């Protein structure tokens, strides 16, 4: 296998591991998976002449700014929301109510992705199909998802993200 996909038990988050040239597997971050899918969607829509002039991408405020550089390159608006897919869903509804933008993709660094408007929450099934399609497409060009991620970094710059979890138990945690 060139890639391994896995979801959480309720299938709303997706993790991806990609085989490196030395045969080992590299786990992609939620931000990297999101940017790979974003780049694939925008590239394909542009190549097909189907990239809407009012296209919009939505991400949470804690997700990578690399998405902003990708969106800018494709002339697509990027909107930040508070953390939580309910806010991405609300933004989609706002777009539909006003007709201001056409939703293209939404994601959070916590491995949640949304590429359609018929679901308003993160969707691991749809995301699995999308990243598998991207992996197949790039394999026809002799590239892996790691190769494409390297191309994205080279084109838009390298972005370092670091997630840290701090636990402050009980009453001592309040101090």
Protein language model features and the residues they cover:
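Phosphate-binding and adjacent anionic-ligand microenvironments
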Residues: 1-3, 24-26, 44, 48-175
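N-terminal small/polar loop signature for handling phosphorylated ligands or for N-terminal nucleophile
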Residues: 1-16
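Catalytic or ion-translocation cores adjacent to nucleophile or general acid/base/metal-coordination motifs
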Residues: 29-41
């Amino acid at each position: 296998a060139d890639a391994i996909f896995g979801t959480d038990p309720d299938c709303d988050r997706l993790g991806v591991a990609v085989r490196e040239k030395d045969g080992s597997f590299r786990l992609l971050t939620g931000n990297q998976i999101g940017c790979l899918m974003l780049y694939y969607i925008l590239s394909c829509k542009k190549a097909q002449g189907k990239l809407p002039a009012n296209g919009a991408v939505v991400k949470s405020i804690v997700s990578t700014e690399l998405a902003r550089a990708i969106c800018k390159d494709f002339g697509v608006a990027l909107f930040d929301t508070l953390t939580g897919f309910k806010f991405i869903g609300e933004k989609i509804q706002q777009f539909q109510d006003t007709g201001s933008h056409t939703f293209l993709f939404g994601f959070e660094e916590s491995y949640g992705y949304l590429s359609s408007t018929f679901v308003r929450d993160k969707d691991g099934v749809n995301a699995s199909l999308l990243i598998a399609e991207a992996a197949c497409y790039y394999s026809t060009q002799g590239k892996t998802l790691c190769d494409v991620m390297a191309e994205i970094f080279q084109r838009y710059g390298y972005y370092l993200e670091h997630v840290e979890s701090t636990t402050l138990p009980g009453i001592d945690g309040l101090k």
